[in-house]
């Protein structure tokens, strides 16, 4: 059973799980892969429990005003808020939104653009579940971002 145990204080997060992590509003975020490989682009990210479970479980912590950019998955994605206050927005333009707090859950369907941002006043944490053993692929929309020049990265 020890290979099926994950203690949060022993998890090793990635501070650059996706290329957008170099941009303002995305820099102060940590991504944890707890069960399964998830969809992070960081090939060095530690996967705590590697055996197949029929889903992938991860976590995200972020400082205020930090989160993800608009993206979609080929699998369903469920967010379970553990602490803090998070804004979730979705749709091709990201104009639909809601605020979630500790204990709240939102399920995002496949192939729908979605994003999140910590709108609280301290570092906050949520757990993320992706359906299936194969977490699918991620599609990122950078249309809402002002990308920096090479000198700024």
Identify the function of each model-found stretch:
Residues 1-54:
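A short, N-terminal "cap"/entry segment at the start of jelly-roll beta-barrel domains
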Residues 42-43, 58-72:
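Conserved short histidine dyad/triad with adjacent acidic residue
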Residues 68-70, 88-89, 114-120:
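Short beta-strand His + acidic residue motifs that chelate non-heme Fe in jelly-roll/DSBH
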Residues 76-102:
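A short beta-strand-loop-beta hairpin characteristic of the jelly-roll/cupin
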Residues 78, 107, 122-137:
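A short hydrophobic beta-strand segment most commonly corresponding to one strand
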Residues 100-119:
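Conserved metal-binding segment of the jelly-roll/cupin
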Residues 143-149:
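Conserved small/polar residues in nucleotide/adenosyl-binding loops
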